[in-house]
Design a protein with these regions (language model features):
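Surface-exposed, low-hydrophobicity beta-strand/loop segments enriched in small/polar/acidic residues
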Residues: 1-101
Length: 101
């Protein structure tokens, strides 16, 4: 499995399914799933997104009901996880924002 792009200690960027980062402890503060037209990674109707922790436990998932319908989810208290996997990412890009622990 390929690794996602870790932009810095605060942002992890997934642009394909099955990208895994198992060796990081991370406090998730926000999750953003958006289209990236320039990269040809648009969200289409019925596209699915599923983010899991390193043990395969579901963190969040969503099915787009219309084209371009992503997700912006804030977790004010944060959610501590060990490892991250974009289990399903049919379209768009996924940003996981928080801090490495």
């Amino acid at each position: 499995m390929a690794a996602p792009n870790q932009v810095n200690n605060n942002v992890i960027y997934f642009n394909a399914a099955a990208q895994t980062l198992l060796t990081i402890r991370f406090r998730i503060k926000a999750i953003v799933w958006v289209s990236s037209e320039g990269a040809g990674l648009d969200i289409a109707a019925d596209d699915d997104m599923l983010l899991s922790d390193g043990e395969g436990n579901k963190i969040v998932g969503k099915r787009a009901e219309a084209a371009g319908q992503g997700l912006e989810l804030a977790l004010p208290g944060g959610l501590d996880v060990m490892g991250l996997t974009a289990t399903t990412l049919d379209g768009g890009v996924l940003y996981v924002i928080g801090e490495a622990l």
